[in-house]
Amino acid sequence: LSKYLSVASGSHFQTNALDGVDQGMAAITLRGMDHASTLVLINKKRQTYAGTPSHEGEGYIDVNIIPEIALEQIEILKDGATSLYGSDAVAGVINFHTYHAFDGLRISASTQQTSNYDQEDRSLGMLYGGEAFDGKYVIAVSTLNRSPLNASEIPKIAELGLSGLGNSFKVTAADSLVSGPYAGSYSKNQTIPDPSCVSNGGVIAGPRCKFLYGERFNIVNDEDHLKGYLHFERSSAEIDYSMTLLMASVDVNDNPQSPSYP
C-alpha cells in the first residue's frame, strides 16, 4: 500500500533485481531520504534490521515480513520526530498496525499479470481469529509466487546494458595488413575493435566493441514468499498478557548476473 504514497519517494518495493544481496526485501523511506532516516515500527515497537544491508550499504527494516492480510492500518508521521524517537526518525515515522482481535475467517487471493509479457504474481492470504484460553488470538498466513521476467523479453531494455570499455586495442605505430581479420591500414594510436564483435554478440560503438550484458539480467526475479503472523492476548485483574510472533521466508530462485563487466 505504501508504494502509492507520494511521501514515500525513495523507497524500494518492487523486485530490486539489481540491488545486490537484498532481493525479495522491501524498504520504505519518507521524503526521499536514505533508509536510515525513517523509523519503521510494528505495533509501535522498534524492529531489528534486515540481515543484509541495502545496495547503498544502509541498514533498514524489511517490511516484507508482515503478511498483508494481517495489516489493519498504517500510520505515517511525515514530519521529523528526532526529539521523541531519536536520530533514526529524521524523515518521519511509519507504524504498521496489525490485527490484535479478529473473529472469523478471511481469505484473499489475487493474480497480477503483465499486459505484454509472460510474468505473473500469485498471492494467497488467510486471516483467522477467535477466542481461546480466556483470551483472543489472531493467525495470518500469506504466500506470494512470482514468476521471472528477463530483460531480453522487453524491447529496447536489454540493449541499454552495454559495457563502458569493450574489447578493443590501440596500435602504437602506423601499420597495414593485407589479409586476415584485421586487414586494413591503421594510423598511430588508432583504437581498433574486435573484428568478430558482432558475430560474437557484441555491439560496435565507434572504435570499440561493447559487451552486451543487459540480456543476462532479470527485470523480475523468480521468487517465493511465505509469511506468518500470530498474536495472542489475555487480560486479568492483575496483569495483561500479550504475545506476537512474525515469521517470513523469502526464496529467490534465480538471480542471473553478467559473467563480466569489461
Regions found by a protein language model. Give the residues of each.
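Surface-exposed beta-strand-turn/loop segments characteristic
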Residues: K3-M25, M33-H35, K45, Y49-P262
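Short aromatic-centered micro-motifs
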Residues: V40
